[in-house]
């Protein structure tokens, strides 16, 4: 069989073997793993492998087979396997068999696994046998020894591996037995290995790792002797062992013990002096410097933990910290952030502890720490500040942590903080240095200063903040910054973006200045200079377009300087030129917009707002400026519209260009409307009317284009606040064009319903709009039903299903808008009354559909509206609906509603298996049903109660329960009946 195993493994690993032969080989291999004969054959091959080498693939397979069978073995078999493994290892050592590392590790894992089964009762001499094997001090023996000991740690001591309670108990017994029988000998053997620096690098690193692993649960006194620690410390000066030595020392210093013992340990180890003896200044091994920083951090954290647990040791701990701080500062100030951030945990813990123990934070120490933090927040000399790479992102994260430290110091020592931050801001921004890194630090700290004032980190009485000296200092800095030539003299993206961000963020500070208007104009001039909106750097340019919009929107400057506004509008003309680009798809097939159009819209909105802010006395100028913006767009649209149908079809860029122009018109109107106190003159409305007409002409010429329909809807929604009732001359045509589109998408109709809901709300008192809605309601509802039906090939596509749910919700929200805006009469006019029954039926259908609970709940909400407005006689109950009195009652609606509402209210919770009131979504539906019943009771009175009584009796409800339900329905208010109904349903379903 051994020969067969050889052949099977060889075939299975072959890249050229026949597939059928390979399948047979795999089948045979699986059989070997699962049979006792196969296991024994593999053990035989393993035992011979010391004298008769086998290839790596076969050996790894044998290790796997043995590993998978250990758990199945009897005590006798375990003893035998343990003996055979030791014989094999002895043979490897005698014959200097040096397998690849992965095989040595796998073999060591076998020893570790069988150790767990034999050490307690079957073979307690396990370690003694290992000691015999390493007595020769051969490197191969020491290598296997250290690997086996490490593997045993992973089996029984690794605290990062989750284990069952049973395994944990077993491991505890194993550790107890080791402590009792072999701990001294083990620790001694490790010390002897460390005393020989000529041992191989792998052996020494493994041995250092072992000390770090086992010290966690062994007697620390065995390790903490001068000779033993000297053996470990020596490797801090050995290039190949120093990193592992740091990790070992971290584990030693981290061992849990009483506070006084831990303080004694820190003193004995004297790690600070050891580190001071190492020359790190010219060390180019960054990993080692990082590990030293980790070690320094751990010593500091351990001292702070001791102080938290035993405050009486303050003097001794403070003395140790005094020795440690120079190393902390050195690591914090290291040129590489990867080193600096390793002492962050200590700094954070220290500052938090200072809040509890103020005596810990001396003024001198915190002053030094704050200065180090500030210096560290500056960009490195080799950073260009332009590239958005991983290093920049990492620096931002580190900066954020440093800022938190700075904020904590501000809380601890407000005067120190204010003094330090004002010095750094003043020197960085106004010291004459044109180094962008220093200036950027000043901007960053100016922003931090304002945040500390806003969050009152310096603990001033709230009523005094705005009159405080720090607040006045900040305002002076801000004004000085705006009036300075700093941003002009230092041409760097970080400075430009930082400046614009600060002035936008702190616009409200400007309002407190007597020179507010001149400051705002100064900022607007900088925005419209080559440093802002026209910046050569695309990132700065696009960011400033948005910042410009935000600034204008937030400050709403009082502008009566027509020359200034005209200059802005004319100057911005080149930036307003729209050049559409077709979108592309990325590697994930997601659509990616090309060009800067979305950012351009901020400019259109800004200009709209600026023009609106001009005094009404300057109407001629306002009209002139609007023409300057609109005319190029009109010309563009005319070119698009005049293209032949074939060209429009073959060149999608034309429709994209038209879309962008329409969006620009709508966005300009939105900007003009930002000043909601504006009273729009007829001249302004005339201009927007022209724009609306152009939108309609464009839509007429692109009737099948979804992009154009979307842009037209967007624009009309923005024209409404300005045109008000004048919109109705365009609205009928617009709605007709949209609904007439034979390729209208579900998502489009969803958005269109939202637009119509806005129309219903804004024009609820307008007779012309009412008539328009009256004429479109039936075709609109038919269109909704057509697109939301579940028939067709696309009915099962997830995206389509989602879109249909959204359409149903939009439809019901639109119905709600009609009810709430006193227009329910629209449902029962001569034009629409035939469709009203379909509307109510659709609501019942949606209510029963629990596949999307939000749709069901919304449908029940609309049924409540139907009951409230049409229940009890079919006459509309809404005194504010001025058309209601002229319309006859809806015949038969009472009987229909009473029957269907009652059925729905009890069939939904009792007959739908998925209806579980423990689920929050179904509970909401249940609560909505209770409101539906309460609404009908209030509207239908005794007639409804009588019908309900008969229905519940037929349902099998006892008379007492029926009486209780009816009584509570009448006497409880809506809120309390909601609770009652949920309890009623829960109890009744629980009794079934």
Curated annotation (Swiss-Prot):
Domain of life: Eukaryota
Key words of the record: Cytoplasm, Nucleus, RNA-binding, Transport, tRNA processing, tRNA-binding
Cellular compartments annotated: Nucleus; Cytoplasm
Keyword tRNA-binding: yes
Gene Ontology molecular-function annotations: small GTPase binding; tRNA binding
Homology family: Belongs to the exportin family.
Protein name from the UniProt record: Exportin-T
């Amino acid at each position: 069989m051994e020969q067969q195993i050889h052949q099977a493994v060889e075939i299975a690993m072959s890249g050229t073997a026949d597939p059928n032969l390979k399948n047979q080989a795999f089948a045979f291999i699986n059989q070997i793993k699962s049979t006792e004969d196969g296991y024994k054959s593999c053990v035989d091959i393993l035992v011979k492998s010391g004298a008769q080498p086998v290839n790596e693939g076969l050996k790894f397979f044998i290790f796997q087979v043995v590993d998978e069978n250990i758990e199945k073995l009897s005590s006798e078999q375990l003893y035998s396997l343990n003996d055979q493994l030791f014989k094999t290892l002895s043979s490897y050592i005698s014959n200097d068999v040096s397998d690849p590392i992965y095989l040595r590790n796998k073999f060591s894992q076998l020893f570790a696994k069988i150790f767990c089964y034999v050490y307690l009762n079957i073979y307690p001499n396990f370690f003694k046998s290992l000691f015999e094997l390493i007595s020769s001090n051969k490197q191969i023996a020491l290598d296997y020894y250290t690997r086996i000991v490490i593997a045993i740690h992973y089996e029984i001591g690794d605290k990062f591996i989750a284990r069952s309670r049973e395994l944990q108990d077993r491991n505890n017994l194993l550790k107890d037995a080791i402590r009792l029988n072999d701990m001294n000998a083990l620790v001694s053997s490790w010390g002897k290995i460390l005393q020989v620096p000529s041992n191989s690098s792998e052996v020494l690193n493994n041995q250092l790792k072992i000390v770090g692993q086992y010290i966690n649960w062994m007697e620390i006194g065995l390790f903490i002797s001068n000779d033993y620690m000297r053996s470990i410390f020596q490797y801090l000066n050995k290039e190949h062992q120093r990193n592992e030595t740091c990790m070992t020392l971290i584990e030693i210093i981290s061992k849990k013990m009483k506070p006084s013992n831990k303080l004694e340990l820190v003193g004995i180890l004297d790690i600070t002096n050891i580190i001071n003896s190492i020359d790190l200044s010219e060390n180019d091994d960054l990993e080692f410097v990082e590990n030293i920083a980790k070690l320094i951090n751990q010593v500091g954290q351990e001292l702070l933990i001791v102080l938290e647990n035993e405050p009486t040791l303050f003097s001794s701990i403070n003395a140790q910290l005094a020795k440690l701080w120079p190393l902390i500062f050195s690591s914090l100030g290291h040129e590489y952030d990867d080193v600096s951030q390793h002492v962050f945990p200590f700094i954070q813990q220290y500052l938090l502890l200072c809040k509890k123990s103020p005596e810990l934070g001396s003024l001198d120490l915190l002053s030094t720490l704050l200065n180090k933090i500030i210096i560290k927040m500056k960009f490195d000399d080799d950073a260009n500040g332009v590239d958005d790479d991983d290093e920049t992102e990492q620096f931002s994260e580190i900066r954020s942590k440093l800022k938190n430290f700075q904020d904590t110091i501000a809380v601890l020592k407000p005067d120190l903080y204010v003094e330090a931050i004002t010095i750094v801001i003043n020197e960085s921004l106004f010291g004459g240095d044109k180094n962008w890194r220093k200036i950027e630090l000043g901007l960053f700290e100016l922003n931090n200063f304002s945040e500390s004032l806003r969050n009152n980190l310096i603990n001033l009485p709230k009523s005094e903040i705005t009159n405080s000296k720090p607040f006045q200092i900040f305002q002076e800095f801000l004004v000085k910054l705006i009036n300075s030539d700093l941003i002009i003299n230092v041409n760097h993206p970080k400075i430009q973006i930082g400046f614009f961000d600060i002035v936008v963020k702190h616009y409200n500070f400007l309002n407190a200045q007597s020179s507010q208007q001149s400051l705002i104009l100064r900022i607007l001039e900088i925005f419209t200079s080559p440093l802002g909106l026209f910046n050569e750097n695309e990132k700065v340019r696009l960011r400033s377009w948005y910042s410009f919009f935000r600034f204008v929107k937030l400050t709403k400057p009082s502008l009566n300087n027509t020359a200034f506004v005209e200059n802005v509008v004319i100057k911005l003309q080149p930036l307003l030129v729209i050049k559409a680009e077709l979108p592309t798809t990325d590697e994930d097939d997601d659509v990616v917009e090309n060009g800067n159009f979305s950012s351009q819209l901020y400019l259109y909105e800004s200009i709209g707002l600026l023009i609106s802010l001009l005094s009404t006395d300057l109407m001629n100028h306002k009209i002139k400026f609007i023409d300057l913006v609109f005319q190029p767009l009109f010309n563009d649209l005319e070119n698009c519209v005049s293209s032949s149908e074939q060209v429009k079809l073959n060149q999608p860029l034309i429709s994209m260009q038209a879309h962008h122009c329409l969006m620009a018109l709508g966005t300009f109107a939105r900007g003009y409307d930002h000043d909601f106190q504006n009273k729009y003159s007829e001249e302004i409305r005339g201009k927007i009317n022209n724009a609306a007409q152009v939108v309609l002409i464009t839509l007429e010429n692109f009737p099948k284009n979804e992009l154009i329909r979307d842009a037209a809807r967007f624009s009309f929604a923005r024209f409404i606040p300005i045109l008000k009732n004048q919109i109705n001359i365009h609205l009928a045509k617009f709605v007709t064009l949209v609904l007439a589109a034979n390729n209208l998408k579900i998502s489009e109709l969803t958005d269109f319903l939202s637009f119509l809901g806005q129309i219903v709300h804004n024009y609820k008192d307008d007779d012309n709009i009412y008539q328009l809605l009256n004429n479109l309601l039936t075709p609109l509802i038919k269109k909704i039903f057509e697109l939301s039906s579940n028939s067709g090939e696309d009915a099962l596509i997830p995206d389509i299903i989602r879109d249909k749910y959204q359409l149903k919700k939009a439809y019901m929200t639109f119905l709600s808008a009609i009810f709430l805006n006193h227009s329910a009469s629209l449902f029962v006019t001569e034009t629409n009354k035939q469709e009203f029954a379909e509307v109510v039926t659709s609501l019942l259908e949606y209510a029963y559909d629990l596949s999307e609970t939000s749709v069901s709940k919304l449908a029940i909400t609309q049924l409540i509206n139907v009951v409230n407005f049409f229940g009890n006689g079919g006459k509309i109950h809404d005194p504010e609906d001025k058309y209601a009195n002229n319309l006859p009652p809806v015949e038969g609606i009472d009987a229909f509603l009473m029957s269907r509402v009652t059925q729905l209210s009890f069939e939904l919770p009792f007959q739908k298996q998925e209806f579980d009131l423990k689920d929050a979504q179904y509970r909401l539906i249940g609560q909505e049903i209770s409101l539906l019943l309460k609404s009908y009771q209030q509207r239908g009175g005794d007639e409804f109660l009588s019908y309900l009584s008969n229905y519940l009796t037929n349902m099998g409800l006892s008379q007492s329960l029926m009486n209780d339900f009816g009584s509570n329905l009448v006497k409880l208010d809506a809120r309390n009946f909601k609770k009652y109904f949920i309890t009623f349903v829960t109890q009744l379903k629980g009794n079934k």
